[in-house]
Each structure stands twice: as structure tokens, then as C-alpha cells.
Amino acid sequence: MFFAKTIENWTDWGAVYQDIPAFLPLARAIFAREGLLPIRETAHLTPGTNAVFRADDFVVKIFAPRESGLDAESDFRTEQAAIRRAESLGIATPKLRGAGFLEDKYRFYYLITGYIPGKEAGEWLKTADAVQKEQFCGWLWDTLRSWNTPCPDGVFRRDMAGYSLQNPRWQGISPAAEAHRRELLPSLTAMPEVCVHGDLTAENLLVPADGEPVVIDFADTVLAPACYELPPICFSLFDYDPGLARMFWKSPEPLADALLAGLLLHDFGANFMEEICGRFLGISPKALLRLEPVENFLRKRYG
């Protein structure tokens, strides 16, 4: 047995997922299985949902076992398929070096990718000059034109409008605002579904010292309208900077309209709405009677 900790629920996983020594015997067994050299050094990376750390020139991602309450196999297959799709489209992403599962105390799915040194894009943008920002935003727009295209059914989750009706995160807004949101959702179902990354946040794009930016963490890839990409980009990656959003947005459609649609659909749309209410509107999402205050904020800020 390589993993000695006990995982019976999400709290157990949360207590251990950043504990590299707890996962190191497991990682060494995985490296041996994949024919990679023994691990010499490890280092922490930005924490997420799963156990992720650097091991020499690789990044090891060990998915939470099903005993944690998370659907690890689905997340694993989604990310594996998305990485391969990105590679086939020529999108810069760490090369996949190993993928599978190891049956131990629990069944652990894993991915091994190459490690690419770089600065997280959210931090990099804070000190980038105007030319660098323009180039970055242009690169991101062009990359998404390639990525946000149709792909075969059955690979990624779809019908985000239908899922959004059941998404428990929306319980955090008032019943009146939620009723208004549900009035608007049917109009979004007619929008064409394409492949979306869904999590292009400040942490999930890396800017190397040389070369083009790199996209990481494809675990939230789904089929959805292209506007689904916008909330993480505008609210996390760009940190609500309308100047960056205007550099990026090259569609004739008003950005505010597309942003609102993406916000209503997104798996974490309720979290973004809560942030907008607290940071910019000075109200609780429980105090919203309808969505107009949020819509007006988006129109005023983004046009």
C-alpha cells in the first residue's frame, strides 16, 4: 500500500490533498509504471481541487478518489481528452506524459504533464506594459477561436443551461432573483454549443519568459455556448479591468450581453455574482429582487 491516509468524505480529502509526503510513495509508484526516472525533488504548486505538485520536470495530478464524494473518473477523462484536443489544435499546453489509474487503498486516477516554468497570467498582467497586454489579449482571442469550436458528443458534459437549473450554488441568491434568472435561461438554450475550457482564471494561464502563453487545467471543459468562457476571463484573469476586456473582445456583440449570458450559465456563476454584489454593488445577493443591478453594472463597466 502506497497511500496510508484515510479518505471517507470531502473533509478528509481537504485535510490531505496538499500533503506531498502523503502522496509521494504513490507518485513514485506511478512514475515507475510510466517508465519515468525516480523522483528526486518535489515542490508545491497553486492548490486546486486535486493533489497537484511538481516532481522534478513534471507536474503530478492525483485526482480525489470517489470516497471523497467527487466524481474523479469523469474529471480525469474530461481533462485527458481536453489536453489531447488542445495538442491536436496546436494550443500550447504542457505535454501529457502519463495517464491512468493506480489501484491502491483507493483507486487513484492520475495525469503527469511536463512542467513549464512561467508566471501566472493574472500576476503577469499587473506589471505588463500596454504592448504586452495587447499581444496577450490578441493571443487569447485567437486561441479561443480555435478552441471554441464544435466537437463530438459524448466526450464532454453538455446542456449547461439544464444543469444550471439544478446547480446548488444558485441557492445563495434571493428567490426573486433566482426566479428572474430562470426566466432568462430558456433563451440561452438555442445558442450553439462549442468546446469551452470554462476555467481560464488568473491561475490557469502561464506566461513563460520566452514563447507564447500556456493553457493549463482542463478539468472543467464542457460543451456550452462560447460566452461560457467570459466570466472567468473578465472577472478573474482580467480582475474586472474593462481596458483588458476591450483589448480582448473583438465580436460585434456587446460584451455586457455575452457576459451576462455566460454568468447565468456558468458552473460558478453564482460565485461571481456574489463577488460582484459585495465588491461593486455593496449588497448581499440575498437582497437582489431581480438581476437588473448586476446587468446594469456589466453594461456600465463593459458596454
Please report, for each region that a protein language model flagged, where it lies by residue.
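Active-site activation/catalytic loop segments of kinase-like enzymes and analogous catalytic loops
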Residues: 227-256, 262-293
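Active-site acidic catalytic loop and adjacent metal/ATP-binding pocket
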Residues: 46-56, 182-228
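Juxta-kinase regulatory segment immediately upstream of eukaryotic protein kinase catalytic domains
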Residues: 1-38
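Glycine-rich, phosphate-binding/catalytic loops in enzymes
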Residues: 128-130, 214, 231-233
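Short, flexible/disordered intra-domain loops and linkers
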Residues: 11-16, 66-75, 243, 276-286
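An alpha-helical support segment within catalytic cores of ATP-dependent transferases
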Residues: 19-34, 101, 132-138, 146-198, ...
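ATP-binding pocket architecture of kinase catalytic cores
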Residues: 41-155
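Short beta-strand segments
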Residues: 61-62, 97-98, 160, 195-198, ...
